[in-house]
């Protein structure tokens, strides 16, 4: 703790000193202009006025720097006194610490099956010691929604997160639902970042009474909110380009040059000795047209595919073994007169006779983050000093590279487990430091591997027709066994004064068939295309909004083109609005896939009926509860329209949870007996507050599980 606090103080002084330097320079420039405007005796007065202002600024800066450590010390003492007062008043309570292990997407059906087979001894032991229950997820059953409810104890209508993205009502284009990032308005200004999630997380409320928390990679915590504790953000943290993850693929094969979803392909020339190309970073607003910044790199090729290549980039040299990820490589991109730092990994796929190399999305460098990815700001830097560099991208496992067959199965697994081991190192480092308070960490490994490898659980899954390597039939079973080993390590560090909670935000099911909601709406005259158009590209490019009553966007919802809400809305609020929702619900509930002879949609949920809250209107009007095996189509999710309603899902992304919430509950384990008859995601936050003897805020919709 001493090293960490010292680091905070030193970095604060450095940051403030830089700010004062810039302020002084800018002030001197302003005053210089005023002085230059005077001719004759007045110039001397103007000069001395400027001199005294600069002198006063210098002494003010000196005083602030001298007193800064005292201010930090006073704040630390105040927090310590508040912290000690709380635990003195509650010394009789059993719970001193709450540890939360989040395993995104851990499925109850698989968990129960593997426990019965004796494959998960630590989960079985935790169940016997305390409790196990299925955990009711949110509607819709999507990670940003569920984890927001976990943090706040609120339903979506009160925390305002209904999906990964929503629509801009003025343009019908997609926008991130959880964060608003605006580009700098000038060369000296930084991007403006604003969280769109409403409500307060339980760790913020605990911090009010001096109870500190360490929160690692809980989704939808970007940008980080100030509170009494430490936090590393996760889902929705962008890459250095400002996207949610853009990989690069370099190839000498013309046949591999394709338009890749989630990445960019670059042609290189293999002359047998070296490959030369560029890495592309953030836009440079100082140049005309704001082109992407770029830095050169070279790969010195080996004589055979089994030898190491040499990577030369940013004055650094790395040996690249074939099909083995490089360590994190630090990059510096020139943007104007500044440098912006990122990190990435390189993976040589082939060198002879053709060259192929994959590069991960360029993550924000945790040692020098261009955006706030942690609280305090220096916490990300501190972790990088403790454990070297690490993934900072919110969605760090590159599912699209596997979908596009740039990576093979092993390449994806290697990347995923590299990220997982980083997370384990962070988690256990923080766990050893947090003796009282909360330590929570969410692992994405369970979610990502099930998404991409579910097809191996089903011999007849349509995705097998699109390729993929054999031999991965046990991948998901091994995943669950690895999580059991993680739990075993964790349980050895849990004492009698620690409440241990292990949970997932949702379960998993097969994704075999795609449902194009927009095509169904088009074929049934709820969505209308422009004159002469038979289909539409992404983001409703050919949609005639003056005649469209309903449209689908995102992973789970249908929006009504409501007059007075959407920019070109035509459906009247009130009776017409309610009648249209009822009509769509009746026609889509029980919708049958005639080619397969099964129901594709179990139920349609009217948001205004299932939720009560001030932000109901920010979500979709109707949430679609898909049957097992079905999900919204890839095209429909991004606003495309064609004439096909049902089609096979051929992508490696073969498992999903964006279904009827009733069939994809999560799991809940804890080392104490539950008193509640059932458990919901919204119950976790109030449960943690009650364990520390705090009153649950009236705004929270969840209930404590041990009361």
State each model region's role.
Residues 36-65:
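Hydrophobic alpha-helical membrane-interaction elements
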Residues 214, 419-453, 624:
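Active-site regions of oxyanion-processing enzymes, predominantly non-cytosolic
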Residues 628-683:
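Low-complexity, glycine/alanine/valine/leucine- and proline-rich hydrophobic stretches
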Residues 61-77:
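Membrane-spanning helices that line or support transport/gating and their immediate boundary helices
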Residues 93-96, 103, 109, 118, ...:
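Secreted, luminal/periplasmic, and some membrane-associated catalytic domains
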Residues 1-37:
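N-terminal secretory/membrane targeting signals
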Residues 455-474, 642-649:
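A solvent-exposed, charged loop/short amphipathic helix patch at secondary-structure junctions
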Residues 75-95:
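N-terminal signal-anchor transmembrane helix
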């Amino acid at each position: 703790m001493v090293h960490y606090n010292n680091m905070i103080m030193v970095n604060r002084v450095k940051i403030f000193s830089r700010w004062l330097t810039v302020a002084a320079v800018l002030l001197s420039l302003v005053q210089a202009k005023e002085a230059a405007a005077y001719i004759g005796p007045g110039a001397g007065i103007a000069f001395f006025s400027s001199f005294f202002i600069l002198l006063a600024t210098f002494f003010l800066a000196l005083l602030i720097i001298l007193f800064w450590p005292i201010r930090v010390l006073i704040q630390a003492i105040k927090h310590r006194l508040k912290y000690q007062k709380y635990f003195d008043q509650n010394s009789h309570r059993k719970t001193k610490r709450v540890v939360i292990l989040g395993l995104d997407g851990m499925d109850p059906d698989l968990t129960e099956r593997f426990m019965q087979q004796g494959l998960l001894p630590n989960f079985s032991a935790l169940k016997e010691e305390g409790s196990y229950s299925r955990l009711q997820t949110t509607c819709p059953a999507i990670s940003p929604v569920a984890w927001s409810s976990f943090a706040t104890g609120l339903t979506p209508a009160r925390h305002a997160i209904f999906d990964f993205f929503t629509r801009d009502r003025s343009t019908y284009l997609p926008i991130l639902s959880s964060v608003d990032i605006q580009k700098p308005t000038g060369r000296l200004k930084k991007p403006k970042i604003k969280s769109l999630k409403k409500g307060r997380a339980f760790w913020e409320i605990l911090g009010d009474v001096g109870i500190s928390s360490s929160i690692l990679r809980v989704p939808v915590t970007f940008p980080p909110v100030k509170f009494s504790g430490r936090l590393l953000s996760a889902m929705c943290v962008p890459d250095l380009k400002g996207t949610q993850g853009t990989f690069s693929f370099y190839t000498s094969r013309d046949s591999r040059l394709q338009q890749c979803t989630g990445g960019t392909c670059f042609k290189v020339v293999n002359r047998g000795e070296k490959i030369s190309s560029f890495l592309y970073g953030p836009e440079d607003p100082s140049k005309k047209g704001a082109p992407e910044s770029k830095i050169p790199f070279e790969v010195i090729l080996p004589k055979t595919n089994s030898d190491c290549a040499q990577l030369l980039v940013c004055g650094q040299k790395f040996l690249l073994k074939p099909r083995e990820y490089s360590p994190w490589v630090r990059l510096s991109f020139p943007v104007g007169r500044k440098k912006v730092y990122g990190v990435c990994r390189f993976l040589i796929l082939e060198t002879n006779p053709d060259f192929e190399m994959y590069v991960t999305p360029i993550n924000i460098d945790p040692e020098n983050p261009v955006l706030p990815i942690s609280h305090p700001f220096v916490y990300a830097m501190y972790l990088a000093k403790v454990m070297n560099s690490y993934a900072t991208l919110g969605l760090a496992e590159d599912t699209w590279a596997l979908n596009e067959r740039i990576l093979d199965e092993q390449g994806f697994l290697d990347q995923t487990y590299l990220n997982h081991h980083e997370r384990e190192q962070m988690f256990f480092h923080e766990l050893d430091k947090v003796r009282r308070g909360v330590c929570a960490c969410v692992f994405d490994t369970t979610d990502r591997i099930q998404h991409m490898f579910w097809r191996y659980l089903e011999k007849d899954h349509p995705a097998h027709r699109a390729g993929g390597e054999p031999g991965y039939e046990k991948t998901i079973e091994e995943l669950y066994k690895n999580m059991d080993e993680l739990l075993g390590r964790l349980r050895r560090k849990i004492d009698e004064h620690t409440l241990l909670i292990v949970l997932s935000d949702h379960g998993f099911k097969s994704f075999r068939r795609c449902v194009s909601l927009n095509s169904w709406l088009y074929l049934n005259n709820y969505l209308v295309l422009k004159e002469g158009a038979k289909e539409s590209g992404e983001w409703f490019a050919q949609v005639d909004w003056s005649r469209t009553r309903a449209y689908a966007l995102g992973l789970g919802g249908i929006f009504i083109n409501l007059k007075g809400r959407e920019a070109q809305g035509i459906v009247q609020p009130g009776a017409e609005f309610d009648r249209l929702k009822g009509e769509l619900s009746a026609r889509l509930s029980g919708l049958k896939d005639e080619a397969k002879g099964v129901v594709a949609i179990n139920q349609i949920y009217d948001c205004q009926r299932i939720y009560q809250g001030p932000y109901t209107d920010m979500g979709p009007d109707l949430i679609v509860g898909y049957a097992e095996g079905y999900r919204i189509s890839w095209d429909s999710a991004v606003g495309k329209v064609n004439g096909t309603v049902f089609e096979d899902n051929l992508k490696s992304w073969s498992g999903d949870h964006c279904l009827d919430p009733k069939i994809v509950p999560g799991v809940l384990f804890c080392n104490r007996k539950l008193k509640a008859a059932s458990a919901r995601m919204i119950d976790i936050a109030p449960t943690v507050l009650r364990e520390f003897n705090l009153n649950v805020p009236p705004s929270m919709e969840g209930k404590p599980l041990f009361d």
